[in-house]
Amino acid sequence: MAGTGVVAVYGEGAMTETKQKSPFSVKVGLAQMLRGGVIMDVVNAEQARIAEEAGACAVMALERVPADIRAQGGVARMSDPEMIKEIKNAVTIPVMAKARIGHFVEAQILEAIGVDYVDESEVLTLADEDNHINKHNFKIPFVCGCRNLGEALRRIREGAAMIRTKGEAGTGNVVEAVRHVRSVNGAIRLLRSMDDDEVFTYAKKIAAPYDLVVQTKELGRLPVVQFAAGGVATPADAALMMQLGCDGVFVGSGVFKSGDPVKRAKAIVQAVTNYRDAAVLAEVSCGLGEAMVGLNLDDKVERFASRSE
């Protein structure tokens, strides 16, 4: 059922399928390889090397981190392919890059230059207000954001191999990321208590594909990896998201907008690895220097997360 976007089922930490793997299942498997890791935003090769040395499982190559996108305004587009290629040449870990929502040509360019994953991102300016990219048309895995279970399953049906919370990138404020992961996981807990008749009604209520709703109920989790993103700025933030049930963490402005990026990058990786060990978390949280300047999410702050559904 690969053509419909049904995902292979989780086994003991690995993909399991009774039939031959579909192209989509392969992409889901590639995304699963990043479980338990930290993905860091970088704007040049030097930052990419710092991230790799700190233990990041992948880097996100972009010209401006979300905090700068917020501060500078204007239209935020796909990064210069030359810059992305320089970052790819500087590290051995996977490299991601962002495309605007609905801008399938930006995604085609990113695939052509050899990025490992594409993030169809609400942090960039929308290219299409009504349609997301048909991600089944691509060979590489896509990452998409969500605020709730309905959004997550719609993105998976379109071909997303990884889901992340939208949060509010560039704010250094984790409250929206927490809200989004609690929304998704709370809905899944509710779903597991439903009978078959109720599942039909619930799928319609959240505007999600029925077969993916059923699969999520059976698994007790999303059928693809779920990372936290948007506002993660400290080791404690990262560990919080892991304890809430995420499979890994994206860190954007929180590292390279801080007082000591090298030390903070290593600390966040350690926090994700040891997210249930309070003694380790206390140790890695010491002496990190000044954290990035955060934003209170009031009416004056643009909500990137609301740009798409």
UniProtKB/Swiss-Prot annotation:
UniProt entry keywords in alphabetical sequence: Acetylation, Cytoplasm, Lyase, Pyridoxal phosphate, Schiff base
Gene Ontology cellular component list: chloroplast; cytosol; endoplasmic reticulum
Presence of the UniProt keyword 4Fe-4S in the record: no
An annotated Gene Ontology molecular function: protein heterodimerization activity
Family note: Belongs to the PdxS/SNZ family.
Assembly with partners or alone: Homodimer or heterodimer with PDX1.2 or PDX1.3. Interacts with PDX2.
Further information: Vitamin B6 is an essential quencher of singlet oxygen in plants, that can protect cellular membranes from lipid peroxidation.
NCBIfam families: PRK04180.1 (NF003215), pyridoxal 5'-phosphate synthase lyase subunit PdxS (TIGR00343)
Function according to Swiss-Prot or TrEMBL: Catalyzes the formation of pyridoxal 5'-phosphate from ribose 5-phosphate (RBP), glyceraldehyde 3-phosphate (G3P) and ammonia. The ammonia is provided by PDX2. Can also use ribulose 5-phosphate and dihydroxyacetone phosphate as substrates, resulting from enzyme-catalyzed isomerization of RBP and G3P, respectively. Also plays an indirect role in resistance to singlet oxygen-generating photosensitizers.
Identification of the protein by name: Pyridoxal 5'-phosphate synthase subunit PDX1.1
Organism: Arabidopsis thaliana (Mouse-ear cress)
Source organism phylogeny: Eukaryota, Viridiplantae, Streptophyta, Embryophyta, Tracheophyta
